[in-house]
Amino acid sequence: MDRREFTAFLPALLAATTLLPETASAQQTATPTKTKAPLPEISSGVYPPGPATGSGGRTGHRFLAGMLKAGNIQIEMHETRQEPGTPHEAVGHHLHNEIWLVREGVCELTTNGVTRRMVAGDVGICCAGDLHYVANAGDVPCEYFVVTVGPPEP
């Protein structure tokens, strides 16, 4: 899938997330949590990368994080670089969907115990609620963009 096909696919994914409010409320925990500051509304424009963050062989840059105009859909985009041999991120699941676009190197996307190989130019997706992680599967750094779309996380 190239970037044009990916951008054509993104509106369908965004539309699908509007069907999630019942699922989102069912997945929320009863444990009280800290109140988060409201996220800004995302508007059309260009978003340059923010400052580098990370450690232990993994670095990243956030491009944007906020709410789409519909008001109930959160979107976030960042770029991650993993050095060879870096332990994968913690296995997790979320209320949102995650889409990866591999820029360079070889990554492994594991969802619900199934591992799939991704190379530069590939797109991977993890649907809301699936257990997942991404790991560097090569002997050179892997770099990928991540777009998350879905209801706000509690």
Q: Model-found features: residue ranges?
A:
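Short acidic-glycine-tyrosine-enriched beta hairpin
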Residues: 114-128
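Conserved short histidine dyad/triad with adjacent acidic residue
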Residues: 76-94
